[in-house]
Amino acid sequence: MYETNMYEGMIAETVTMQGANGDTINAYYARPLGTGPFPGMVLVHHAPGWDEWYRETTRKFAHHGYAAISHNLYHREGQGKSDDVAAKVRAAGGVPDAQVIGDTEGAAQWLRAQPWLNGKVGVVGTCSGGGHAFLFA
């Protein structure tokens, strides 16, 4: 529960991690300041792409005491505006489920390797990310 006298510092940054097939992809993570331990949460983005909403939501989880990571499922298609990259992915037929699951496993492993994690990792997604979170679980 939120308390008005809570300290609200956090760390948030873009990191690289190992995804499916050993590919290096980027991810955005946030966690509260301090040594933890914190529970982990993996956020699987929606079909419109790895956008600002996922960064905001990653920080929101950190605000509530989680170490959260949102990995870029479209990293292999290049960088740019999320709408443009998502359109490119859709035109190519989307991302195979096996690749999404492999990338999501990589994000969970990245969290589990951190010294401030308490060992617990959940997964959440919206839109197609919700379906992928279900497949992953």
PLM regions: where:
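Alpha/beta-hydrolase fold nucleophile elbow
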Residues: 114-126
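Histidine- and/or cysteine-centered catalytic micro-motif in compact active-site loops
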Residues: 10, 74, 126
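Gly/Ala-rich beta-loop-alpha elbow adjacent to hydrolase catalytic centers
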Residues: 125-129, 133
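Non-catalytic accessory segments flanking enzyme active sites
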Residues: 1-2
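Serine-hydrolase catalytic machinery in alpha/beta-hydrolase-like enzymes
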Residues: 5-6, 14-116
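Aromatic pocket-lining residues of Rossmann-like dinucleotide-binding sites
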Residues: 61, 136-137
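Active-site signature of alpha/beta-hydrolase-fold catalytic machinery across serine-
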Residues: 56, 135-136
